Each structure stands twice: as C-alpha cells, then as structure tokens.
A protein has these predicted regions:
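Short alpha-helical functional segments enriched in proximate histidine and acidic residues
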Residues: 15, 90, 94, 179
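Basic, helix-initiating cap at the start of DNA-binding domains
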Residues: 1-19, 23-32, 49-52, 73
C-alpha cells in the first residue's frame, strides 16, 4: 500500500518539475504510472492534496541544508536567517509551486496536511535533524509558525523584545509571500534567482538590525551564494554567513550592520 502511494507522489512530483503546477491532474498522474484514476482516489481525496504532498518533495535540498546547519553552533537569530536564505534559494526557482503550497490555503491546512502526509511516507527525509528542528519541520502548520519558533527563542535569549519577534515574524512572512507572488510565471536565469535571493536577504537583514536589542549587531561574513565556481553542490554551499555579535565597546547602537567580503 505504502509503495503504491509513493509511486503516485513521485509521479506527481515529476509532472510538477517537468510541466508545472497547472499540468498535474489525477488522469495525467494515473497515465504516467499506468493505473486507474480510482486507484489514486483511494489514497488522495482530490488533486489538490496530491499536488501539495508532492510539492513537499521540492523541499528536500532545503531540509538537507537544514540538516547541515543543525550541526553548526549558532544562536536562534543566526539560524533563522540562514534557514530563510536556504528556503529562498530553493523556493524562488519554483515560485508557483511554493506559493501554492505555503499560501494556497489561508488557514494553513493544506500545508500542514501535506507535511504530515509526505513525512509519513518519507520519514527518512527528516533523519539527522536535531529535536527542535525536527519538530519545527514536522509540526509547524505555516511558514509564520516555523519562523516564530526561532524568533521566540531569540526573545527568550534577550536578543529581541517579544514585540520585535512578533513584528519580524509578520514582516518575514509578508516579504517572502510577496517575493513568491512576484516571481510566479517569470522566466529567469540562474543569476537572476541569485540576485532576488540576495535582495530578499538584504531586506531581511536590514529589518533585523532595526529590531535587535541594544548590545547586539549583525555581521555579514560572506554575502555569496556559491563557493568559488558556479556549480551548485549542497555539500559545498556557501551562502550568507550571518553572525549576531555583542557590541563590546562604546554605547550600543540599534541598527548597526557591518559587512565584509
């Protein structure tokens, strides 16, 4: 039974990757694997649920990067910004699919059900994540809820006020949604996607610098997206390396941001 469901998910994923969101139907998925539509309906009540579950498969590289980041010692704000950069890097290339997945259902029901359905079939995709990150990926019902986990931890650590955590959660989500919406249907080159990811991160970092508690500043260590050459390799990824640092000398100033190449 489980093997059959995986076939349906993977066939829908292949159609999404090859032909786009509007190309997927129960009939096309059934034709792709040589089964009847009735067989699919035994596992998925409608095409929207199948598309949502299959869309989670596009997050595999993002989850792999999160697995790598979970092994690096970072505070909650550093980790949150790194995760946002990873999510932007992958989702902007499939803006239509991710806009539909994250925001196609305003109450978050589609995303949470898709996450649950996908990881029931592919629990191995979550292997190696730390406990709180595992919970964050598996249990968060919306993008905003995932964001709030780390922002609230930062507030508990005294890096943000509670009000700032709420403000940044809203801002992060609205900005991400706006970027996805703007990118839908646009035919861009790889350099263009890097540029919009860079723009997204610049806007986030500027916003975060205005909300840090006194005594903290943001240091952008390496604002690059690919290490040395243009070949993308998950194990060689070099993206924003953000450090939230204490300001040790002189009066602390909110909104101070430093960047070095």
């Amino acid at each position: 039974m489980s093997g059959a469901k995986r076939k349906y998910i993977e066939a829908a994923y292949e159609l999404l990757a090859r032909d786009g969101l509007n190309s997927v139907s129960i009939r096309k998925v059934a034709d792709e694997i040589g089964c009847s539509s009735a067989a699919l309906y035994r596992h998925f009540p409608d095409i929207n649920e199948l598309i949502a579950v299959a869309s989670i498969r596009f997050l595999r590289d993002y989850i792999e990067d999160a697995r790598i980041l979970s092994k690096v010692e970072m505070n909650p704000l550093e980790l949150n910004l790194q995760l946002w950069e990873c999510l932007a890097y992958y989702s902007f290339r499939n803006a239509e699919i991710f806009d539909n997945l994250f925001f196609g259902n305003s109450d978050g029901g589609r995303y949470s059900e898709a996450v649950r359905g996908y990881f029931e079939e592919y629990p191995e995709d979550l292997a190696g994540l730390k406990d709180f990150m595992l919970d964050m990926f598996r249990d968060a019902t919306t993008v905003a809820e995932r964001d709030s986990v780390l922002l609230n931890r930062a507030a508990e650590n005294g890096m943000l006020s509670r009000d700032a955590a709420v403000f940044l959660c809203k801002l992060d989500t609205y900005l991400f949604r706006g970027m996805l919406s703007d990118l839908r249907g646009r035919d861009l080159e790889e350099d263009d996607f890097r540029w919009v990811t860079r723009e997204f991160m610049d806007l986030l970092i500027r916003s975060y610098t205005t909300q840090l508690e006194e005594g903290y500043s943001i240091l952008v260590v390496k604002p690059d997206f690919v290490a040395q050459n243009a070949t993308r390799d998950a194990d060689e990824r070099s993206s924003y390396r953000v450090k939230i640092i204490p300001v040790k000398f002189g009066p602390a100033t909110k909104g101070v941001s430093k960047a070095t190449a």
